[in-house]
């Protein structure tokens, strides 16, 4: 019967089961050796069909209701599951048998070398074992024995192979099936798995800008961008139904394929105008979006309003005047102006500037709430762009209900009642005569009515009330009767009752109590004095008290902190220094509570030492609690100890006079103004970073005409909108610090490494405070000083800062707080922790890498600001911050405090950044031609030379600094 084993399959002569085919041999699995003869017979009620793995070695015989599948030379490729079905059976019954061809040389039979599925479907890799004994040691690996990706969920079936459940796009790899045979791993051939993205619809499109206007000859750019989860899609840009040939740029971002078409027009002309459409399509369909490009001959500026330019409003009501502006180029300036006639004051409107349809149309709103009589008149909106000035004027007239008065007089010898009524619109007048004495004739019997359809107009000027006069001639006054003058217009009505008493008569307006002038005067004075007393009491309660911001933690449980009472800290007499050994100089800064004075200390540290120091002291009018607060600050500083990046305590005078706290003298002033001076030196006063679109700049304290107070102890220059100086600027030669002096303050241009240097040193100082369980509570660039060698030192200068006039400190309750630097939990829950200091440090980083901009530029501190903070709003990346530095800021601004990094982690990261910067030198400063010593000096030589000059600078403030050119600033 030939080599191998002959398996005789008996023909079933009877039908077994209802509607289910029968396979002989009737076993679920069959194991044979290579070269064996295998015969499989299937019998059913009708015709039957076989289904199984494809193989060239099978022979098929059909005989009515039976079908025979046979081979005389079985190979590993015959391994698989064979299923017999009866096509005509409505119940769909079937029978199956699994065949193993046990080939030691070929342990795996791979039925397909490529498998394609959609994402989140199960992917079956059909590698079948030829020997069931090997099932215990099977596994799935990537090619070359690499392990599977994490979170890969798979299972194995000896009849079907490996199944990767809910396959992901990232799992598109080449895989191999592995089995243990004789203690060694044997691999199948590779199977490529392709996991395709599920395409939800046509590609997403963006066309920028949504509308475009250009003057003939200007440059223009139109960007058409399409993205999809699958790379197989087309995109094109067409102009007025003409497809444009534009090079395509491709990218893969956020798990989406992106294709971008950019049309650049160097000089636009009228033929470039028209409709532009961005069209993209894939297997799911087509998507398109359009924009209109308008080319004009010259600049234009159009003003219009949907409102009537002549407005009438009842006094006390509100009005919003709206002007729609259509302009190109954009506005260079705009304002609302009051043109009279009542007063020369200008309105202080609440302006709402909202972009309506597109970039070139705006709506400006002048809000006039609760209109007063003096606010009637003409309001003009003026706007300017390169196309010229335009104005739109509204005329506002106020409507008033009539005011009425009546007097008795004689005209041409006849007794006459004279009624004067004023209001707008012009009032009509009616006379009534009624019986009895009453305030209104509605309450009595009306005897007679006279209408005056044409009262005499006494005055009628634009925007004023109209005053009319009506005369009623009365021959004889009936003393038991009332004469009433009524006036009415569209707004309301008014009346005055005239009641004859005797031979004369007196009048009184209805519902009005009569007081003697003496009683009224006394009551007015008493009310005024009471209000004045309440105001003084309120001001006293609102006045901020000097307190030390720094807090030292004694213990904590969760977010509940117990702080050490600084008054209970010991004071070591070793810090005591003789008052007579201090020679005071100029005042460095003065605030609401005290001042800081430059001084020379003789014998501090060493007997013959002469050292320049800064001395903190209170004002002579200080209260006892403020004296206690300064003493607490002294105790905290002595408790913390010394650190290079803290403004260190050098000594104190606590006996025989007011308390004096002696600290290090920092010659370069505070970090905030240092950065702002650098920004001005580099970019100029009108080109500093963050220029306001209306023509102003964010550095409102930087002007060429202004003088600067030298910030030796951390006090800023005078006249800053957002940062208030603690004393007026002196113009004397001793106290002023001119801009020429500032230009000479530092001989080396600013580089990225300097900003990293400042950031790292502040982080080290904060890490030191954190290690001492100290919370700063006011981490900001204004509270960081720079001393010799540009060493950054952290301090607290609340003593000498006028927080009443510093807009950085916002009133919350009875306190003034730097809310733009505060963490959400500090603002809303009054919780201060080391983690809240980390948030503030992130704001300080933003200040450093924006070169001294005010945080949250353009955002006022109001309810919207608090909502932004609560919702997790984060400022944009500063212009001079590398991406990884901005990542630190974002980590510091995590809403959950426990998710913020520690200061130690920040230190480590910044030190690594500094080392990387030294290696790569991506950001460099060009050597200044004005610098002595030649232009060929290396940066390290310049740095050493600059460092050697720091001490001279600190003592004399007199070294030359090259101008910072924009191209020296390589890290923006």
Curated annotation (Swiss-Prot):
Q: Which gene encodes it?
A: CSF1R
Spell out the Low complexity composition-biased ranges.
928-940
Which positions bear Phosphotyrosine?
A: 546, 561, 699, 708, 723, 809, 923, 969
A Gene Ontology annotation in the biological process aspect, one of them, is: mammary gland duct morphogenesis
Means of activity regulation: Present in an inactive conformation in the absence of bound ligand. CSF1 or IL34 binding leads to dimerization and activation by autophosphorylation on tyrosine residues. Inhibited by imatinib/STI-571 (Gleevec), dasatinib, sunitinib/SU11248, lestaurtinib/CEP-701, midostaurin/PKC-412, Ki20227, linifanib/ABT-869, Axitinib/AG013736, sorafenib/BAY 43-9006 and GW2580.
Annotated catalytic residues: 778
Any one GO CC term of this protein is: plasma membrane
Q: Which residues carry this modification: Phosphoserine?
A: 713
- Processing after translation: Autophosphorylated in response to CSF1 or IL34 binding. Phosphorylation at Tyr-561 is important for normal down-regulation of signaling by ubiquitination, internalization and degradation. Phosphorylation at Tyr-561 and Tyr-809 is important for interaction with SRC family members, including FYN, YES1 and SRC, and for subsequent activation of these protein kinases. Phosphorylation at Tyr-699 and Tyr-923 is important for interaction with GRB2. Phosphorylation at Tyr-723 is important for interaction with PIK3R1. Phosphorylation at Tyr-708 is important for normal receptor degradation.
Q: What is the effect of changing residue 765 to D?
A: In HDLS1; impairs autophosphorylation upon stimulation with CSF1
GO MF annotations, alphabetized: ATP binding; cytokine binding; growth factor binding; macrophage colony-stimulating factor receptor activity; protein homodimerization activity; protein phosphatase binding; protein tyrosine kinase activity
Q: Does the keyword Signal apply?
A: yes
Q: Which reaction does it catalyse?
A: L-tyrosyl-[protein] + ATP = O-phospho-L-tyrosyl-[protein] + ADP + H(+)
User: Which range is the signal sequence, renumbered to this chain?
Assistant: 1-19
Q: Where in the cell is it found?
A: Cell membrane
Disulphide bond pairs: 42-84, 127-177, 224-278, 419-485
Q: What is the effect of changing residue 782 to H?
A: In HDLS1; impairs autophosphorylation upon stimulation with CSF1
Cross-referenced Pfam families = ig (PF00047), Ig_PDGFR_d4 (PF25305), PK_Tyr_Ser-Thr (PF07714)
Which keywords, in A-to-Z order, does the entry hold? ATP-binding, Cell membrane, Disease variant, Disulfide bond, Glycoprotein, Immunity, Immunoglobulin domain, Inflammatory response, Innate immunity, Kinase, Membrane, Neurodegeneration, Nucleotide-binding, Phosphoprotein, Proto-oncogene, Receptor, Repeat, Signal, Transferase, Transmembrane, Transmembrane helix, Tyrosine-protein kinase, Ubl conjugation
What result follows from mutating residue 693 to H?
In a lung squamous cell carcinoma sample; somatic mutation
Conditions for induction:
Up-regulated by glucocorticoids.
Q: Where is this region: Regulatory juxtamembrane domain?
A: 542-574
Which PANTHER family does this one have? MACROPHAGE COLONY-STIMULATING FACTOR 1 RECEPTOR, TYROSINE-PROTEIN KINASE RECEPTOR
What's this protein's family per the entry?
A: Belongs to the protein kinase superfamily. Tyr protein kinase family. CSF-1/PDGF receptor subfamily.
Chief place where the protein resides: membrane
The entry's free-text remark on domains says: The juxtamembrane domain functions as autoinhibitory region. Phosphorylation of tyrosine residues in this region leads to a conformation change and activation of the kinase. The activation loop plays an important role in the regulation of kinase activity. Phosphorylation of tyrosine residues in this region leads to a conformation change and activation of the kinase.
- What is the protein name stated in its UniProt record? Macrophage colony-stimulating factor 1 receptor
């Amino acid at each position: 019967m030939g080599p191998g084993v002959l398996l005789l399959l008996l023909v079933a002569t009877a039908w077994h089961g209802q509607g289910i085919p029968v396979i002989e041999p009737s076993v679920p699995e069959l194991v044979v050796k290579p070269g064996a003869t295998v015969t499989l017979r299937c019998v059913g009620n009708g015709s039957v069909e076989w289904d199984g793995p494809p193989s060239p070695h099978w022979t098929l015989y059909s005989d009515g209701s039976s079908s025979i599948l046979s081979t005389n030379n079985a190979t590993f490729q015959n391994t698989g599951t064979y299923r017999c079905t009866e096509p005509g059976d409505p119940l769909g019954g079937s029978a199956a048998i699994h065949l193993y061809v046990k080939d030691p040389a070929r342990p795996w039979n791979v039925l397909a070398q490529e498998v394609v599925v959609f994402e989140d479907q199960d992917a079956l890799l059909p590698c079948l074992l030829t020997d069931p004994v090997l099932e215990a040691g099977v596994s799935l690996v990537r090619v070359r024995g690499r392990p599977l990706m994490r979170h890969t969920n798979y299972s194995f079936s000896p009849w079907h192979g490996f199944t990767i459940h809910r396959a992901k796009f990232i799992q598109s790899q080449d895989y191999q099936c592995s089995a243990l045979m004789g203690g060694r791993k044997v691999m199948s051939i590779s199977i490529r798995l392709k996991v395709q993205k599920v395409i939800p619809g046509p590609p997403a499109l963006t066309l920028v800008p949504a509308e475009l206007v250009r003057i003939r000859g200007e440059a223009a750019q139109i960007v058409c961008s399409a993205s999809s989860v699958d790379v197989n899609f087309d995109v094109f840009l067409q102009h007025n139904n003409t497809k444009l040939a534009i090079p395509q740029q491709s990218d893969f971002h956020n798990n989406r394929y992106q294709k971008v078409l950019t049309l650049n027009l160097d000089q636009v002309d009228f033929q470039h105008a028209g409709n532009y459409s961005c069209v993209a399509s894939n297997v799911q369909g087509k998507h398109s979006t359009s924009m209109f490009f308008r080319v004009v001959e010259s600049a234009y500026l159009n003003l219009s309003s949907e409102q009537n330019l002549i407005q009438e409003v009842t006094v006390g009501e509100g009005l919003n005047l709206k002007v729609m502006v259509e302009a190109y180029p954009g506005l260079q300036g705009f304002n609302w102006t009051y043109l009279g006639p009542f007063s020369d004051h200008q309105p202080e409107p609440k302006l709402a500037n909202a972009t309506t349809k597109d970039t070139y149309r705006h709506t400006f709103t002048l809000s006039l709430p609760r209109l007063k009589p003096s606010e009637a008149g003409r309001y003009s909106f003026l706007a300017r762009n390169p196309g010229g000035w335009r104005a739109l004027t509204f005329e506002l007239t106020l409507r008033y209900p009539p005011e009425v008065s009546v007097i008795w007089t004689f005209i041409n010898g006849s007794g006459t009642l004279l009624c004067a009524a004023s209001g707008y619109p012009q009032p009509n007048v009616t006379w009534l005569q009624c019986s009895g004495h009453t305030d209104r004739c509605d309450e009595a019997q009306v005897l007679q009515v006279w209408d005056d359809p044409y009262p005499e107009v006494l005055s009628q000027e634009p925007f004023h009330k109209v005053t009319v006069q009506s005369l009623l001639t009365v021959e004889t006054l009936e003393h038991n009767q009332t004469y009433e003058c009524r006036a009415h217009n569209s707004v309301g009505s008014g009346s005055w009752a005239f009641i004859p008493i005797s031979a004369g008569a007196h009048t009184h307006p209805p519902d009005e109590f009569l007081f003697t002038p003496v009683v009224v005067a006394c009551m007015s004075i008493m009310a005024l004095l009471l209000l004045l007393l309440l105001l003084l009491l309120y001001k006293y309660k609102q006045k901020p008290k000097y307190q030390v911001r720094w807090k030292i933690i004694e213990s904590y449980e969760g977010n509940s902190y117990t702080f050490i009472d600084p008054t209970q800290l010991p004071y070591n007499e070793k810090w005591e220094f003789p008052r007579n050994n201090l020679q005071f100089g100029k005042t460095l800064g003065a605030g609401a509570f005290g001042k800081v004075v430059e001084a020379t200390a003789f014998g501090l540290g060493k007997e013959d030492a002469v050292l320049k120091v800064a001395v903190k002291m209170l004002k002579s009018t200080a209260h006892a609690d403020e004296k206690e607060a300064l003493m607490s600050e002294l105790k905290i500083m002595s408790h913390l100890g010394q650190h290079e990046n803290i403004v260190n305590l050098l000594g104190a005078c606590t006996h025989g006079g007011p308390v004096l706290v002696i600290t290090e003298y920092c010659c370069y002033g505070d970090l905030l103004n240092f950065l702002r001076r650098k920004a001005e030196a580099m970019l100029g006063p009108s080109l500093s970073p963050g220029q306001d679109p209306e023509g102003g700049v964010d550095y409102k304290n930087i002007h060429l005409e202004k003088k600067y107070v030298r910030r030796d102890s951390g006090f800023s220059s005078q006249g800053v909108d957002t940062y208030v100086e603690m004393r007026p600027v002196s113009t004397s030669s001793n106290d002023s610090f001119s801009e020429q002096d500032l230009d000479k303050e530092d001989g080396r241009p600013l580089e990225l490494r300097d900003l990293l240097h400042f950031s790292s040193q502040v982080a080290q100082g904060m890490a030191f405070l954190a290690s001492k369980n100290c919370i700063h509570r006011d981490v900001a660039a204004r509270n960081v000083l720079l001393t010799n060698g540009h060493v950054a030192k952290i301090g607290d200068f609340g003593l000498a800062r006028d927080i009443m006039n510093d807009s950085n400190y916002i009133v919350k309750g009875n306190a003034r707080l730097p809310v733009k630097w505060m963490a959400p939990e500090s603002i809303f829950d009054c919780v201060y922790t080391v983690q809240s200091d980390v948030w503030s440090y992130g704001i300080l980083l933003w200040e450093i890498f924006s070169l001294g901009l005010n945080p949250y530029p353009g955002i006022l501190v109001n309810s919207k600001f608090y909502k932004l903070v609560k919702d997790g709003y984060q400022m944009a990346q500063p212009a001079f911050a590398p991406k990884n530095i901005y990542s630190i800021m974002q980590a510091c601004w995590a809403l959950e405090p426990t998710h913020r990094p520690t200061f130690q982690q920040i230190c480590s990261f910044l030190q690594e950044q500094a080392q990387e910067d030294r290696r790569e030198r991506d950001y460099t400063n060009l050597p200044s031609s004005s610098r002595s010593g030649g232009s060929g000096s290396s940066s390290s030589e310049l740095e050493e030379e600059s460092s050697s000059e720091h001490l001279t600078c600190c003592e004399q403030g007199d070294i030359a600094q090259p101008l910072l050119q924009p191209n020296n600033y390589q890290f923006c």
